[in-house]
Structures are given as C-alpha cells and as structure tokens.
Amino acid sequence: MASIEEIAHQIIEQQMGEIVTEQPTGQKIQIVTALDHNTQGKQFILTNHDGSTPNKVILARQDSTPGKVFFTTPDAAGVNQLFFTTPDLSTQQLQFLTDNSSSEQGPNKVFDLCVVCGDKASGRHYGEVTCEGCKGFFKRSIRKNLVYSCRGSKDCIINKHHRNRCQYCRLQRCIAFGMKQDSVQCERKPIEVSREKSSNCAASTEKIYIRKDLRSPLAATPTFVTDSETARSAGLLDSGMFVNIHQSGIKTESTMLMTPDKAVSCQGDLSTLASVVTSLANLGKTKDPAPNSNEVSMIESLSNGDTSYTSVCEFHQEMQTNGDVSRAFDTLAKALNPGESTACQSSGEGMEGNVHLIAGDSSINYIEKEGPLLSDSHVAFRLTMPSPMPEYLNVHYIGESASRLLFLSMHWALSIPSFQALGQENSISLVKAYWNELFTLGLAQCWQVMNVATILATFVNCLHSSLQQDKISAERRKLLMEHIFKLQEFCNSMVKLCIDGYEYAYLKAIVLFSPDHPGLENMEQIEKFQEKAYVEFQDYITKTYPDDTYRLSRLLLRLPALRLMNATITEELFFKGLIGNVRIDSVIPHILKMEPADYNSQIIGHSI
C-alpha cells in the first residue's frame, strides 16, 4: 500500500514538486510544495472546486495500487475532485483526483463510501451511508438480537477485505458511526397488494387482522383508538403501532380481549399451554357443572359456532380448583414419561463436583458452587413462534406465542445448576413468585421476534372497541390500559439500551434469586446466589463496556419497574383466552416436573 511519502517521491520524479503533509488542524489540511529544495515552499490548503473551503476532508482509504489516495467527507457524501490551492485562492492549482483510472468512477462521477468498511456505498441505510454488506449485517444482528464475541482486544480492523473477520467489532463500529437500531425495529413484511389500504393506518408495513367470524368473506374493518383519555394512547397511534382489526366480542369484567379463531390442531404438541390444557380435557374431566344462561349466551356469542372453543370453555369451568389442575397435570406427566423421574431434581442430586454443602456458624448449610453461576449456555435464548402464522391474528396465536415464551423461561431457569440445587420446593416457590418478571424480561428480549408492539396495540384496540360496546367498564379498561402502557414503556426502554444476551441472562438471574418474597425457605442461600450473579454481572459489564461507566446502574434501575407489573393482568391479557381461569401459579409446578425434552423441541429454534 502506497504511503504519502512514496507518492511524494513519485511527484518529484514527475517534476511536480515535493509534498509535505501535516496533521489536520481545525477545519483544513495544509500541504506544502517546493519545486526546488533550495527555495521556500508554497503553502496550499484544501478547497472545493468553486473556491469555497470545505468543513473537513479525511483520508478514507489507500488503494493497493500505487499512486491512489481516496478522500471523503465525514458524512460520507463523497469527494471526487480535490483541489489544492494557495490561501489567497490564486489561479495556481495542484489537482488530485480520487480515481481517474476507471471509466465507471471517473472524475465526473461521484460515489459514496461506506462509513463502516470503506466499500462502495449503495445509499443511506438506518441513518448512515453504508454498503449492502454492512446494511444486511446490521439488520440481521439487530432483528435477531445476535450476540457476538471478539477474540482479540475489541479493536479489530474493519475494512472491505477484513470486515467479516470479527462480527463483534463490526457491529460496534456500525453503532459507533451512527447506524440507528430503532430504524430496524420499524421494518415489517411487505403488505400484500390485494389487501385494502387505509389512509388512517399508521406507517407499519405489516397488517395483522383479527376476525370474529371465520366464515365472513369481508375484509377486516379498520378501527383506531380515538379516545383522548390519555396522551399515551395518542402516542401509540403516532408511533405507527395500530393495525386493522375487526370488532371483537369481549367478556364483561372477566374480559376476554379477543374472540378466538379456530385453532390449528395441536394434539401431540406439548410446546404450549394451549396444547397441555387441551390434552387435560380428556384426562381430568369431572362432573359437568351447569353454567348459567348468561355464561352460555356469552360463550355462544364469542365462539360464533366454533365447537372447539365451546369445549375449551366447558373445560375451563370443569377445572375451578388447583387440586383438579394438579391431578390433571400429574396424570399427564405420568402418561408422557412412565417410570421416568421429573426434570426437577432434589437438592444436590446430579451436582457432584459442582455444588458443595458448607456448614456455617449456625445450623444452616450453605451451598457453594464452583465456577460461574451462569455459563455461555445460559446466554442463548431461542424462541420459535407458532407455525404457520395465521392470516388473521387471533387469540390462540397470541396465547400460544406467550405460552412458548413462558415454557422457554421455565426451561432456562431449570438449566441453572444453582437453581436446581435449591431443591424442588424452593425452585417452585421462586418461579411462582417471579414468573411475571421473567416473562416480562422475555417479552423485551424477544420484542422483535414476537412482534410485541403489534400485540400490545391489538390489546388497546380491543379494549377501545369493548368500551364502545359497553362490554367492559371504564374503570376496568383504565386498569388494563395502564398495564399495557407499563409493558410498552418498559420494553421500549430495554430496547433502547441495546442489551445483549449476557446482560439479559444476568438480569433474569438477579430477578430469579430474589430472597424477599414471603414464604421462601433458606433465604440466606438464595441471597448468596443473587450476590454471585450481581458480582459476575458487574465483572462482565466492566470488561465488555469499559467506557460506559453507568451502564450497570442503568440496567439495574430497570428492575424495579418489573415489580409494578400485575401478574393477574398479565394472565388476563396473554393467557386467559387460551386456558381460561386456570392460574399460571397452578400450572408452574407441573411444568417444572415435566422433562424438558417433552416441550423444548417445539419452542426452541431461532436465536434471539
């Protein structure tokens, strides 16, 4: 690669003089030339073709071909012709061309350079001028929330030829040069031409519909929240979150937000709560209670002749007590895994060599785990959405997506040796106490994959429709709306922080090992695990983000907001339309007793 000094010698041979370069000072680059070594050289400054002085021009790259020097402006607008002239802008000029050897990139054509790698740019992508390669790399990394690691010292050279060697440094360079992650969040799948476009619809390029009558050939009627009750509701409209939906039936007070579509058969698929509860319908049937006339009419109006939904509602009424749920899930576990032990092992079982009991000053035995609390295997959080995606978004699809996230969170907790070492009773108590916090963190982590923004906007639309139809009280709607806005604000704040997989794993561990829930046993041991998670978390951030002094504080300050999320409302929004009045608390012990192989083959897939 030719250096400035080599170019200078070439110019001397061409009798153009000697170039002596100085470091950029202020807003200009100074170049001194001298045709004769015995005479004083003239001073030249960089200027535009029209004689005006540019703000700043920097060396973009040096081509391997001798004699080529490429300059560009900081905004990558591209500089094709560079003129060196005297400060008084006299007619004496020394002209350099960026590339005069190519017919495609001649002096009359301006081309942009990628701000990340220096390759030829194809346009402005996500806020900066980049090439197609860096554009696609950045989009994949942000959409899938990929976690990279650097094998070097996190200062790898990123250029056209070496940009694929270190993905970590390449992504950090994309962010450092101003590529906006929020721009990636706004992209959606293209709208089908056959679908009706509404001028009221926001800028989202993906329309998801909810239909009440499966047999209706009509397209969904667009409805939007126009109530000025809160400014935040209008803010959702401005952000392009709302979608076209059909007016949906809603239960009063107990509030089923959307009428269910006909569910795809899920027999034999134990990946979601829907399939588990459906299987229990044949295992845990008791006497058929006679519903009152109001409930029957409401079920008929919601189901619109959908017999599968009617049977699910009947099953919901059959399982009113936790005892029924427990017996049904126990029966299911035995039927699925005869003679096999459950996934949740007793304290210390299978942990030889990793976990040791230490007797303290008192009679309490403390568990000390060798090595880190979390390993690299706990960073990956892979979620597969239900497939195929229905043409019309319905309660079953939302519920199954949420239940897959719930199962995946349970599986993640079970994979931590320290969690299993606490014993089955403590493990169940911890998950029952903090499943809502873990689920909410999962929503933020899977924000893009689950399309959470659209789901929340759908909830808001349905609540607005139900209020207009007098199917829900204003007080109840306000309570649900406040919860939705809390979810929205929390997830948005997490997305803006650009949290990686390691940070999400440690945040979940700190939440999971919280000793302040009443009824927990061995709280001192749980607190020790939480302290260990915090120390490892602090060490990771210090090494990974040495220049971000307050990053740890910002992340930890997001955790108190999780305690403001009402678990009952979360159940109502995401799960009630799928499993009715069966509480998540009653389901958790049976999920933890199931072998992970019975459900994780369906919920584990694409990396988040």
UniProtKB/Swiss-Prot annotation:
The PTM entry states: Sumoylation requires both PIAS1 and UBE2I. Sumoylation appears to dissociate NR2C1 from the PML nuclear bodies. Enhances the interaction with NRIP1 but inhibits interaction with KAT2B. In proliferating cells, stimulation by all-trans retinoic acid, activation of MAPK1-mediated phosphorylation and recruitment to PML bodies with subsequent sumoylation, suppresses OCT4 expression.
Q: Which residues carry this modification: Phosphothreonine?
A: T221, T223
Q: Which UniProt keywords apply?
A: Activator, DNA-binding, Isopeptide bond, Metal-binding, Nucleus, Phosphoprotein, Receptor, Repressor, Transcription, Transcription regulation, Ubl conjugation, Zinc, Zinc-finger
Give the position of the cross-link Glycyl lysine isopeptide (Lys-Gly) (interchain with G-Cter in SUMO2). K251, K593
Q: Which PROSITE patterns match?
A: NR_LBD, NUCLEAR_REC_DBD_1, NUCLEAR_REC_DBD_2
Give GO terms for biological process. Answer: cell differentiation; regulation of transcription by RNA polymerase II
Where does it live in the cell? Nucleus; Nucleus, PML body
Q: Where are the zinc fingers (NR C4-type)?
A: 114-134, 150-169
DNA-binding region, as residue ranges, is located at 111-186
The molecular function terms in GO held by this entry are: nuclear receptor activity; RNA polymerase II cis-regulatory region sequence-specific DNA binding; zinc ion binding
Q: Where is this region: Required for interaction with KAT2B?
A: 1-179
Q: Coiled coil where?
A: none
List every stretch annotated Required for interaction with NRIP1.
589-608
Domain of life, source organism: Eukaryota
The UniProt subunit note reads as follows: Homodimer. Heterodimer; with NR2C2 which is required for chromatin remodeling and for binding to promoter regions such as globin DR1 repeats. Interacts with ESR1; the interaction prevents homodimerization of ESR1 and suppresses its transcriptional activity and cell growth. Interacts with NRIP1 (via its LXXLL motifs); the interaction provides corepressor activity. Interacts with HDAC3 (via the DNA-binding domain); the interaction recruits phosphorylated NR2C1 to PML bodies for sumoylation. Interacts with HDAC4 (via the DNA-binding domain).
What is this protein's function? Answer: Orphan nuclear receptor. Binds the IR7 element in the promoter of its own gene in an autoregulatory negative feedback mechanism. Primarily repressor of a broad range of genes including ESR1 and RARB. Together with NR2C2, forms the core of the DRED (direct repeat erythroid-definitive) complex that represses embryonic and fetal globin transcription. Binds to hormone response elements (HREs) consisting of two 5'-AGGTCA-3' half site direct repeat consensus sequences. Also activator of OCT4 gene expression.
Give the record's family classification: Belongs to the nuclear hormone receptor family. NR2 subfamily.
What is this protein called in UniProt?
Nuclear receptor subfamily 2 group C member 1
Give the organism the record lists. Bos taurus (Bovine)
